[in-house]
Structures are given as structure tokens and as C-alpha cells.
Amino acid sequence: MQHTVPTNALRFLSIDAVQKANSGHPGMPMGMAEIATSLWGKHLNHNPLNPHWFDRDRFVLSNGHGSMLLYSLLHLTGYDISIEDLKDFRKLHSKTPGHPEYDIDIGIETTTGPLGQGIANAIGMAVSEKIMAAEFNEDDIKPINHYTYAFLGDGCLMEGISHEACSFAGTHKLGKLICFYDQNGISIDGEIENWFTDDSIKRFDSYGWQTICVDGHNIEEIDKAIVDAKNETNKPTMIFCKTIIGFGSPNKSGTADVHGAALGEEEVIKTREALNWDHDAFKVPQEAYDFWDSTKKGSELNLDWDNLIKTYDEKYPDKSAELRRRIKGDLPDDFENSFKTFLSECDKNNTPMATRKCSKACLDFFVKELPELIGGSADLTPSNNTFSSSSSTFSNENPSGNHINYGVREFGMSAIMNGMVLHGGIKPYGATFLVFTDYARNAVRLSALMEIPSIFVYTHDSVALGEDGPTHQPVEHMVTLRSTPNLNSWRPADLVETAVAWNEAVKSKKTPTCLIFSRQGTSAISRTEDQLSLINKGGYLIDESDNSDITLIASGSEVQLIIDAAKELKNHSISANVVSMPSLDLFLQQSEEFQSSIINPDKPILVVECSHPNSWYRILNRKDKVIGIESFGESAPGSELLEHFGFNTENVVNSAKSLLND
């Protein structure tokens, strides 16, 4: 086996950075160096001088703890990561945090670290490539023509999301997805044969993947496997790479000791001797830089594509204009006016119905207007109402379909959606019941962390869903979503608020959105033009009284309840301001002046929402009150449960009177 200077440059930059930080994971970079050399040195099409080049190959490091391998590759190939940045590994505000964080300006395609999600992101990228290729490619010109590559490890395949996502990928024959499994047999606790004895080859065969086995330290074998993977166009490929974790370390290779800790000064010296590396820390010989420099080749590939696009402009001007718009992430020029017309129609024709049905009515507009809007559901399409009048099912026979049946895979769906957004050119939305956000939670969190505008649709939003009982009735879930930084949640009351919520979601550039809808019917609320214009602020006055005694606030299906309660309070000589709060998150982003214009801080506040009350204390004083739910639900008809938990006019009126009497 030959271990070249360029390959060992990867190893020792990783070793030295982890050693300097006295923190990190050197074992994986040392073990996967040959795999990286083969892929990045010969096959990966990318341009370090233009990381945003749209037809670049995507690379995902799913085993994100090995981040120094990626940072070393980016530095050596010519991205904006310097030796000083490598020396700052794991320091505050550095370009090189402990796990890779999405930053396409320096070549990092996605945030990884929570194991398994990277492979799901990569699958999402491959889905976007397949959809866009079907939409834009012509027989003579193919502007969308790239591969998605992913590195992953034993931990990724132990995580359940790997099953969800990889099964999905095989079903959809994602032939331009090529993955490399670092099969080193070691995790933090030691040798995995004590807890992970799956026959992973048979596992992936059963998914419908091509499986190839190689010596992970033999560059020639790896190179041939990549060629074979590219030649298989109807299956994703998993290349099983037998490796030695911490390769080159005389005393720690092949052990858990090298997984997540610096080698130590003495072992670093011995590793240098073992691999004949006579260079000081962070010193890379010129021959390694010469080998790795990808700026010239990348620029040439990028220029070839630019020229292809010019020809595409000439032959297919309409498609080319649409592709350019999609790459930029802009909405169509006439979209704003079209939405204003649609919103006016919603206001004029507002009728009582479940907000999940309101969402379907809105999707009939949005999906028709926005071809980049790709929907889906985790096997709840009829319940979530995600299939619009202009939807068609994505399949191998219909790769340009705009609705994906994800199966019962909430976590996989959410992480795949994130990958679709990261790819660009696609705006995905995916749905399940609100209670099952627990399954999807970490992918939703990562979308917020990455500042990408995934759209998560959650229906059946309270105990009012009824007989399915507490396993399906959300209570604490909106609190969790609302407490997540950079995540906007909406719980609209009717068709008009639903339309505004959807519009804000599709306009978003850096913030994911959760759209939360009811199973049961809701009322249609009358509004003035001024009230209509304030919905996108997150909260607004539905009814305002001079010299009001109290402010009633609600979201979603409870808005009509507080409207009715306010009318009843008038019979008791109590005047109430009524506030609809479809998005507490957005309301809290407004100025204090605006918030005070909606909620009088000098008057008592009563909030009514069919969920756990903890979200609301950010806008309340000690003596204010929330009518909410602090226990699990029960199995019964929804109307009975609402009465049982006090969501009725009488209880709201009595609570308001009690609050005023305290």
C-alpha cells in the first residue's frame, strides 16, 4: 500500500489541529484519508473560487465529528480556509468549529454532527438534482448534471434515520448518489461487534442500492469503485470501505482511544515517524499543495457550464429564465400581485372550515404559482391535505412530480427536506401530525441552526382531534417549537390567516417555518383592511374597545372562542380587546412600540390556547393568566375534550372576571 504525501498531508493537518485544540476527533480523518484522496483528487467537480457554482457536485460529511478532514480538504484545494483557520479549530467564532456548520462561501454544504442526518441531507440533495434535471434538461443540453457524495460511519448507520432515508433513496433509484461507509468497526464505547452486528451489505442490497466493497486504504480500488458507481444510473451506491481508525498511529490505531481525543505529543511524534512525515506541525510541502490545488480545474469546469448555459439561453430562453430565477431563489416577478389578489379572494370568500382544509385551499394557489414548491407527507396525505389541485406524485416514472410520498418517516422526511433546500432551486414542504414533531425534532432544529427556509406542516394541533387519544394529541409541542431560535411557527385561525402564513413561509430566505393546522372546523373571522395588513406581524387586534378592561389573546381555533367571550363580557359591563396571535414568534420580533399598541401592558391579559401555557409567559405579567393544558389528553370526541379542559365561553368569561377581581 502506498500512502502518498498528499494523503498524509490530510492526516497531519487533522492530527495537528486536534492536538493544538486538545479537542476533536483525529481517528476518522486518519482512516479516511485515502478515500478522500481518491474522491477529491480525481472525481469531485467543484470550484473553490466559486463555491456557489450551481452544477457542482455536492459533498456531505455525515460523520461530522471528523470535521478536520473536511477543513483540511477545503484548505488544500483552495477554498477560503487558511492555515491560521485550521490552527483556530474549535475556537470561538472560527471558521472551523468542532462539527461542520453550513457555509457555502467556504465550501461546507450542510451542518453535520448529529449522526445519520448528513446522509439524509445528501439524499435530499440527490432528490432535488433528479427533480430539476427532469424539469430543465433537454436531450442536447443538460444544465443540471451533478453527483452527490457522502462520507458516513458506523454511528450513522446505527441511527434510525439512516434506515428511513436510505430505504427511501433505494426506492427512488437515486443513481447519482454515491456514499462511502467508513467501516472501521470502532465507536466511542469500543469495538462495535458487541452492539452492531448487522450485515450492512445485505441491508443495502435489500434497499435496492448497488454495494461495492473495497480496501479503504487502497486508492486504486476506491477509484475503480467510484467509476463503477457512476456507471450504475438506476441505483444509489454504497461503497463499503474497510479502514483502520487512526491509521498510522503505532499505539492507538484500531482502538477507541483515537476516536475522540488528541493523540498526545508523544504519539504524534511516533505517528510522524511511522508515516515518514518529517514536517513540523501545520507545515505542508509544496508538492501536496500542487496535487490538491483545484482552482484551475474547477474554474475550467465552471466556465464550461457557463458557456453551456449561454447556449441554453439561446435555445430554451423561457426554461433558462426560470432556471436562473430558481437558482437565485427569487419569487416570480408577478407573484406579489398574484398573492394580493388571492388574499382578497380569501377574505371575500372566507368560510368556516378546518385550517388544514384552509391550507389545502391555499396550496391550490401556491403550488400552481411556484413550480419550485415540492410537497410531501409522512404517509398522512389525506389527513394533512398536502396534495394540491396541481400536484402530481414524484416517482421513478414521474421524476418531475411535485408531491413526495415519504412513507412513515417523519425524521427522514424532515432531514431530506433540509437537503433539498440546501441543494437550491427547490422549496420543499412536508407534513405530519403535530404530535410527531417529536420524531422529526432534530432535523427541524438543524434547519433553524443552518438558517434555511424549510417548511414543516403540522396538522391535528390539539386535544380537539378527539378519539385517537393522548398518544396523538399534542400538548407541549408548540412550546418546543416556539422556544427554538430562528424558527417561526404559525397557528392560523381561518383561511385568511392561513394564506398569510403560507405567504410568509414561501418568502422566507433564512428562517424555517412551522405551519400548524387544526383537524376540527374553525370560524371565518371578519376583518378590516387595516387588520388584514397586520397579520404578518404575528399578532393584531380583532376587536378594540375604548378604555378596555382586559386583553384576550388566542391563536388558531380558540380565536373565535375569545371573540364570543368578549361579547359575553359586555353583558357584565366588561370591555375587552381581542387579539389574534397566529405567530407569537413573529410578534415578539416586532418593536416594543408595536407590541404595546396591540397589547396594553397596563391592563390584565388572559390567553386562551389549547396547548401547554409556557410559551406565553414571555408577554405576561405575574398576575396574568393562561387557559391552557398542562396534562396529557384523553380519548373522547373532540367537543367533549374541549369542554373537559375548559375551552368554552363560560370558563373564559369567569376566568376574565376572576382576573379583574384579583
Question: Which functions belong to the PLM regions below?
Answer:
Residues A17-P26, F54-S62, D105-G116, D347-N350, ...:
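A short glycine/serine-rich beta->alpha loop
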Residues A9-S23, Y181-N184:
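N-terminal capping segment at the start of a domain
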Residues K91-D103, N121, V127, I131-A134, ...:
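Thiamine diphosphate
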Residues G31-H172, F387-S388, M420, R527:
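Cofactor-binding active-site loop characterized by glycine-rich and histidine/acidic residues
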Residues A21, D57-R58, I108-T111, I141-E159, ...:
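A short, small-residue-rich loop immediately preceding and capping a beta-strand
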Residues Y79-F89, G170-D182, D205-W209, A448-S462, ...:
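A glycine-rich helix N-cap at a beta->alpha junction
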Residues D80-G107, L373-N402, V578-D585:
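Anionic-ligand anchoring segments at beta-strand to alpha-helix junctions in alpha/beta enzyme folds, i.e.
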Residues I309-P453, Q531-Y540, D546-S548, I553-G556, ...:
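Non-catalytic terminal/interface segments that mediate subunit docking, oligomerization
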